[in-house]
């Protein structure tokens, strides 16, 4: 049994095949960095146009690879269903019409996928085992959340950002520092040359016992420091280091509170920012000290990808969560706690 997965929620176009016996047998992704880099951020209209061209290329490529063209008997035998992201994400990027057309042409059902749930399950894809129930830190360009996952489809948001997501703040500060897009990794690379303690930035909302985050004030504060500092490489490195430490410390403090509140064995970390080296080091220390088990997504699954979509589609197909209805709806503001199985 094979599931075709498609991911287009933001600026990565990705297609994958998950097989019941063999696992992830194919995974192809095209980014749009060259399209958006000169704007230092994602331009929704350009992202939408790029998806149409890139998805067509990837589908042709993956079908040709498995000799699916001009085959009279593959319709029912090769793919059992098409799983694709319906939200959250950029409205123009979620190309459900193309995905539904593929399902209709193959006469197979489709599976609606919550992009955030895909990120959570990317950790289970990485380790190839069931980790429910678990606590999770989801940190990406658009999301910063602490989540209690009871079982497949049942997720409780314990805390989330009240304004900016961690990844967004990383990219914003990277832009102010004059670094290229995408900025998060470039900022972390620059921070390696910084001297710790040259600056001290606030750890927002860490004096509160709730699990929510807020980074807009920190973002503005660091921006003002940059604009009033010298343009030297060392000065930029020092600011980058202190900023990264402030972000990571804030996440760690909130994770510590979550661990005390929810008594489960497994702690999962996912999303693009989960590949951050400093975050991984400090989380390992925290989880080891509290005698829990820590699981990260493989780095190739940290950013947006269809591997996690196909895998989640496989799990949902096994539970009968698929449809033949002619729905073309998208859900740009979908929450991890929303149930879309039968929409």
Swiss-Prot record:
PROSITE patterns: GLYCOPROTEASE
GO MF entry, a single one: iron ion binding
Entry keyword annotation includes Cell membrane: no
Record field: catalytic activity: L-threonylcarbamoyladenylate + adenosine(37) in tRNA = N(6)-L-threonylcarbamoyladenosine(37) in tRNA + AMP + H(+)
Database matches in Pfam families: TsaD
GO CC entries: cytoplasm
UniProt-recorded name of the protein: tRNA N6-adenosine threonylcarbamoyltransferase
Organism field: Buchnera aphidicola subsp. Cinara cedri (strain Cc)
């Amino acid at each position: 049994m094979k599931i075709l997965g498609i991911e287009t929620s933001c600026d990565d176009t990705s297609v994958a095949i998950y097989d019941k016996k063999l696992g992830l047998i194919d995974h192809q992704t095209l980014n749009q960095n060259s399209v958006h880099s000169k704007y230092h951020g994602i331009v929704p209209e350009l992202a939408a146009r790029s998806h149409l061209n890139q998805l067509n290329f990837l589908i042709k490529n993956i079908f040709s690879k498995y000799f699916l063209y001009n085959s009279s008997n593959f319709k029912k035998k090769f793919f059992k269903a098409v799983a694709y992201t319906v939200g959250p994400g950029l409205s123009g990027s979620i190309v459900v019409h193309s995905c539904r057309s593929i399902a209709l042409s193959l006469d197979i059902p489709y599976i609606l996928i919550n992009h955030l749930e895909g990120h959570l399950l990317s950790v289970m894809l990485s380790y190839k085992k069931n980790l429910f129930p678990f606590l999770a830190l989801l940190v990406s360009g658009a999301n910063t959340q602490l989540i209690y996952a009871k079982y497949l489809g049942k997720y409780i948001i314990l805390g989330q950002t009240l304004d900016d997501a961690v990844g967004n703040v990383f990219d914003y500060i990277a832009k102010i520092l004059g670094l290229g897009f995408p900025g998060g990794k470039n900022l972390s690379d620059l921070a390696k040359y910084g001297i710790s303690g040259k600056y001290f930035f606030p750890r927002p909302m860490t004096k509160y016992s709730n699990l929510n985050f807020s980074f807009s004030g920190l973002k503005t504060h660091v921006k003002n420091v940059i604009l009033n500092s010298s343009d030297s490489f060392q000065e930029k490195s020092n600011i980058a280091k202190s900023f990264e430490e402030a972000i990571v410390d804030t996440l760690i403090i909130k994770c510590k509170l979550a661990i005390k509140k929810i008594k489960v064995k497994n702690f999962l970390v996912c999303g693009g920012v989960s590949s951050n080296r400093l975050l991984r080091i400090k989380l390992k220390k925290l989880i080891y000290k509290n005698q829990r088990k820590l699981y990260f997504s493989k780095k190739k699954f940290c950013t947006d990808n269809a591997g996690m979509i196909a895998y989640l589609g496989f799990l949902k197909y096994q539970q009968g969560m698929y449809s033949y209805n002619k729905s073309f709806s998208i859900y740009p503001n979908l929450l991890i706690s929303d149930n879309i199985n039968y929409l």
